[in-house]
């Protein structure tokens, strides 16, 4: 019986599209090119898609013979001696899908990729370029005048911008789900109810697998979570026709990975953001929720920590923490018909029974378990009601829904006016967020795949004992989720998520035995590395939804941002305003067409003729009303029954049906992650190795001066980091010039002036405006007359740079040591020392090294055998003869020694 499980690696990783006049032949192979599959695509159908998959696994020789026959069979009589009948159209790395507008189908292929992360040996790639190929032949093509316009709209979705995929790791699910799924078949076989389960369904591809016995490994592949899959509509037409290895699901969002080097021990910190494909769109055009409970700008962010010393999922140490952002789950919008920086918020529909919020939170209970914690960052005190409208409605909805949930699983609501606290000089925003983060992580816990370390049991930490979640024999599970929102879910939300992630990261490091206390300080290499990841994450998500990068960053809320940052904030605000006003409508049309929300149909209005897309996203407006859920029992009974555990991770018939389990031998390529990661069949170089090229705390953040503590958890001064000191040329000179310029520069603009149209400020709320304008810049000003002090800052003493200080005159002992050092160096390089005689007083006792061996200059092509003396040769020959039974006669000394041994032992 198999005792282990592993994810199945797709056998279609390299593709070549061959073309004839009647068909396309798509040949796919694994990376080692030992197994091949072939798809046949008919080109004679003008509007229908005909794809044939024979599901046969070819060898390389069989594929060559097949292509050779196709080449000969498609040659015409005129070209028997000349051109080929089979043309190689394009090489690719995966199929994004098939799409049709008003003419025939197109095939979308990934032609360039770049590795972005590595999780347990499973590579995550970013799409760099794609190719869109029209399938029908020109002889059967039926042209339509609007086809080219639809094609331009579809291609406006830039697939080379933050789309990710993996051949072996399910990016649509969390690490906790993926590792839980690997245990499901093994636990099912061990359970007493396995027989009853087998009678009701069969998840195993091999018949009689359970009764066969023997050793092996379960290969497991699960269904993706379609909410975070962006090409599901493009693959839907072939999903039931072709082998599942052809289906490559992609996600949209962000993926970044950095290496935390802890005294030489590599620890990978990975950040993955999954953007929902439901109710997706741009900032002002997608607000609130639709009728199915899907909210705008919904992003699931997961931080993964793994010890890179061990690659395997079963033997390695892995930890993750998940949190979510999303628009307030109500029917609300903002009118953008008038040119206003902050359009008024309006409630489109009354929802007294919180029906749409109930659907949304029921989905979250099923995926994440309980408790659901809402961190609401919108304003609560305004002279003119703007953001406060959302707070009041959200409080009412949560209060209503909590009446019908069990008390231990109620929704936790945390309101906090972050913009108000930012304006106050007496309140530290991040300190308050840190308190909230501690309480949140203690309630939800986090995932780790190993039990508590022995030192944690002997010397338990007080905070560790209060940690929530679900404890299992093999580790911990995260139960529940933090849902953070403001108005746009961009700037404030990203800072709040960073603080919660920083708190969770401390617990993750503590669980892996890397720190002695679950606490991380600012201005350490580890936190700087993590902050940079989160800022890249926030910039990417902000560009996707708002059209610009973040306006307010972590440094802004720490109030340590340089004065030059304010001008950048103004530019980002203007960029966001321009994008929202002029380009959001076109981007929304592209998203609707790409995701299949709108299907072009002959005789019906075109996409650009629709006055609004409201009816596309709210399907109940164009059909009969479906049966509504109960207003009191708004949750799914099966979901609540298994709380606080997420229902999607519970071993039950519904979840096991989503798995495909197949038995493999231990070293088969479909489950051999070692072979997939190291690829011993190809030549590689260190320059191209991903793990050496990724961002590292030691190379990019740790100071390069001598005597610095190499620990990434040591608090450093702002000017000691590797980024600020060695990241740019002449940084210290630039810092001096910046301080001189700042002395004569005007004070930084207030936060109201910086982002009048950003999400963090309201044009009518100016209660604490004075506190902002009085904020002083954190950069220390240097007067123009202090040139001597500026020079001292540039030229540091040797003691501070190298950790040693040389006096004006050396002692006699030091002088002798230095003379010996020079003598050794000269002897090493065999220099002429005729004119470099040292005085006898200094050269006494100098070590003279004389080589006693001379080695030949061997190379990879030729090695000269060393010379062996006669005695050694005789000993070796006697050893060989002894193994053949030919013993040498004993000498007198050996005989005397043996007699002495017998006398002492037996007599």
Curated annotation (Swiss-Prot):
UniProt keyword Hydrolase, yes or no: yes
Tissue: Wide-spread.
Predominant place of localization: membrane
GO cellular component: endosome membrane; lipid droplet; recycling endosome
Ranges for domain SAC: 154-547
Subunit structure as annotated in this protein's UniProt entry: Component of the PI(3,5)P2 regulatory complex/PAS complex, at least composed of PIKFYVE, FIG4 and VAC14. VAC14 nucleates the assembly of the complex and serves as a scaffold by pentamerizing into a star-shaped structure, which can bind a single copy each of PIKFYVE and FIG4 and coordinates their activities.
Ranges of biased composition (kind: Acidic residues): 758-770
Catalytic activity annotation: a 1,2-diacyl-sn-glycero-3-phospho-(1D-myo-inositol-3,5-bisphosphate) + H2O = a 1,2-diacyl-sn-glycero-3-phospho-(1D-myo-inositol-3-phosphate) + phosphate; a 1,2-diacyl-sn-glycero-3-phospho-(1D-myo-inositol-4,5-bisphosphate) + H2O = a 1,2-diacyl-sn-glycero-3-phospho-(1D-myo-inositol 4-phosphate) + phosphate; a 1,2-diacyl-sn-glycero-3-phospho-(1D-myo-inositol-3,4,5-trisphosphate) + H2O = a 1,2-diacyl-sn-glycero-3-phospho-(1D-myo-inositol-3,4-bisphosphate) + phosphate; O-phospho-L-seryl-[protein] + H2O = L-seryl-[protein] + phosphate
GO molecular function, one term: protein serine/threonine phosphatase activity
Function per UniProt: The PI(3,5)P2 regulatory complex regulates both the synthesis and turnover of phosphatidylinositol 3,5-bisphosphate (PtdIns(3,5)P2). In vitro, hydrolyzes all three D5-phosphorylated polyphosphoinositide substrates in the order PtdIns(4,5)P2 > PtdIns(3,5)P2 > PtdIns(3,4,5)P3. Plays a role in the biogenesis of endosome carrier vesicles (ECV) / multivesicular bodies (MVB) transport intermediates from early endosomes. Dual specificity phosphatase component of the PI(3,5)P2 regulatory complex which regulates both the synthesis and turnover of phosphatidylinositol 3,5-bisphosphate (PtdIns(3,5)P2). Catalyzes the dephosphorylation of phosphatidylinositol 3,5-bisphosphate (PtdIns(3,5)P2) to form phosphatidylinositol 3-phosphate. Has serine-protein phosphatase activity acting on PIKfyve to stimulate its lipid kinase activity, its catalytically activity being required for maximal PI(3,5)P2 production.
Key words of the record: Endosome, Hydrolase, Membrane, Neurodegeneration, Neuropathy
PROSITE patterns membership: SAC (PS50275)
PANTHER family the UniProt entry points to: POLYPHOSPHOINOSITIDE PHOSPHATASE
Name this protein carries in UniProt: Polyphosphoinositide phosphatase
Subcellular location field: Endosome membrane
Database matches in InterPro entries: Fig4-like, SAC_dom
Enzyme Commission number: 3.1.3.-, 3.1.3.36, 3.1.3.86, 3.1.3.16
GO biological process, one term: negative regulation of myelination
Transmembrane segments annotated in the record for this chain: none
């Amino acid at each position: 019986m198999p005792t282990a499980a592993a994810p199945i690696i797709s056998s279609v990783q390299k593709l070549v599209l061959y073309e004839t006049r009647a068909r396309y032949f798509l040949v796919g192979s694994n990376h080692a090119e030992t197994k091949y599959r072939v798809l046949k695509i008919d080109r004679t159908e003008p509007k229908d898609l005909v794809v044939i998959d024979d599901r046969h696994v070819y060898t390389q020789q069989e594929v060559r013979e097949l292509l050779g026959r196709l080449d000969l069979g498609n040659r015409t009589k005129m070209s028997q001696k000349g051109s080929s009948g089979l043309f190689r159209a394009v090489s690719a790395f995966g199929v994004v899908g098939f799409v049709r507008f008003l003419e025939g189908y197109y095939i979308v292929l990934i032609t360039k990729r770049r590795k972005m992360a590595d999780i347990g040996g499973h590579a995550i790639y970013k799409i760099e370029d794609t190719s869109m190929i029209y399938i029908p032949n020109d002889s059967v093509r039926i042209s339509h005048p609007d086809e080219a316009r639809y094609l331009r709209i579809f291609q406006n979705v830039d697939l080379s911008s933050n789309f990710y995929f993996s051949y072996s790791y399910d990016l649509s699910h969390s690490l906790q789900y993926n590792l839980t799924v690997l245990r499901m078949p093994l636990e099912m076989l061990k359970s007493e109810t396995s027989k009853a389960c087998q009678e009701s369904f069969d998840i195993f591809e091999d018949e009689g697998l359970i009764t066969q016995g023997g050793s092996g490994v379960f290969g497991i592949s699960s269904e993706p979570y379609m909410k975070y899959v962006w090409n599901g509509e493009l693959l839907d037409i072939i999903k039931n026709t072709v082998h599942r290895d052809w289906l490559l699901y992609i996600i949209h969002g962000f993926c970044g990975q950095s290496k935390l080097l802890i005294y030489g021990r590599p620890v990978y910190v990975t950040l993955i953001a999954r953007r929902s494909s439901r109710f997706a769109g741009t900032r002002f055009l997608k607000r609130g929720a639709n009728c199915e409970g899907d909210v705008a700008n919904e992003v699931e962010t997961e931080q993964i920590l793994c010890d890179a010393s061990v690659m395997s999922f079963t033997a390695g140490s892995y930890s993750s923490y998940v949190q979510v952002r999303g628009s307030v789950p109500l029917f609300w919008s903002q009118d953008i018909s008038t040119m206003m920086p902050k359009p008024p918020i309006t409630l489109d529909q009354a929802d007294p029974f919180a029906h749409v919020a109930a659907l949304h939170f029921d989905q979250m209970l099923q995926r994440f378990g309980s408790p659901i914690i809402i961190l609401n960052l919108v304003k609560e005190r305004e002279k003119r009601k703007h953001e406060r409208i959302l707070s009041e409605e959200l409080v009412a909805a949560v209060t209503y829904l909590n009446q019908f949930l069990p008390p231990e699983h109620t929704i936790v609501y945390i309101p906090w006016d972050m913009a108000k606290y930012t304006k106050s000089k007496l309140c530290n925003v991040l300190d308050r967020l840190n308190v909230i983060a501690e309480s949140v992580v203690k309630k939800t816990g986090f995932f780790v795949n190993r039990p508590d370390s022995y030192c944690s049991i002997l010397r338990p930490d007080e905070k560790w004992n209060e940690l929530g979640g679900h404890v299992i024999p093999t580790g911990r599970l995260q139960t529940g989720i933090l849902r953070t929102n403001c108005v746009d879910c961009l700037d404030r939300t990203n800072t709040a998520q960073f603080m919660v992630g920083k708190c969770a990261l401390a617990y993750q490091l503590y669980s892996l035995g890397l720190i002695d206390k679950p606490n991380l300080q600012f201005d350490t290499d580890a936190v700087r590395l993590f902050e940079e990841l989160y800022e890249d994450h926030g910039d990417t998500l902000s560009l996707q939804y708002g059209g610009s990068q973040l306006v307010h960053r972590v440094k802004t809320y720490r109030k340590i941002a340089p004065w030059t940052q304010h001008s950048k904030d103004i530019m980002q605000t203007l960029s966001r305003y321009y994008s929202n006003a002029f380009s959001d409508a076109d981007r929304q049309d592209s998203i609707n067409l790409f995701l299949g929300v709108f299907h072009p149909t002959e005789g019906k209005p075109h996409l650009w003729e629709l006055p609004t897309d409201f009816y596309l996203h709210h399907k109940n407006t164009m059909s009969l009303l479906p049966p509504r859920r109960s207003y009191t029992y708004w949750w799914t009974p099966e979901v609540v029954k298994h709380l606080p555990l997420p229902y999607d991770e519970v071993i039950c018939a519904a979840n096991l049906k989503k798995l495909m389990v197949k038995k493999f031998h231990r070293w088969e390529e479909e489950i051999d992650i070692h072979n997939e990661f190291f690829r011993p069949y190809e030549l590689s170089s260190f320059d191209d190795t991903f793990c050496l090229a990724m961002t590292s705390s030691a190379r990019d953040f740790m100071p390069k001066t001598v005597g610095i503590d190499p620990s990434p958890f040591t608090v450093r001064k702002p000017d000691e980091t590797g980024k600020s000191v060695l990241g740019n040329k002449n940084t210290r000179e630039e810092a001096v010039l910046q301080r001189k310029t700042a002395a004569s520069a005007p004070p930084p603009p207030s936060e109201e002036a910086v982002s009048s149209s950003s999400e963090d400020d309201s044009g009518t709320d100016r209660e604490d405006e004075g506190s902002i304008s009085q904020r002083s810049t954190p950069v220390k000003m240097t007067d123009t007359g202090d040139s001597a002090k500026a020079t001292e800052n540039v030229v540091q003493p040797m003691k501070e740079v190298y950790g040693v200080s040389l006096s004006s005159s050396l002692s006699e002992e030091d002088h002798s040591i230095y003379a010996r050092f020079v003598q050794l160096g000269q002897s090493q390089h065999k220099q002429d020392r005729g004119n470099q005689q040292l005085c006898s007083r200094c050269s006494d006792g100098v070590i003279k090294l004389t080589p006693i061996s001379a080695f030949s200059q061997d190379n990879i092509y030729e090695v000269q055998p060393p010379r062996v003396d006669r005695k050694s040769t005789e000993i070796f020959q006697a050893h060989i003869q002894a193994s053949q039974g030919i013993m040498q006669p004993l000498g007198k000394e050996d005989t005397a020694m043996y007699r002495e041994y017998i006398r002492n032992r037996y007599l």
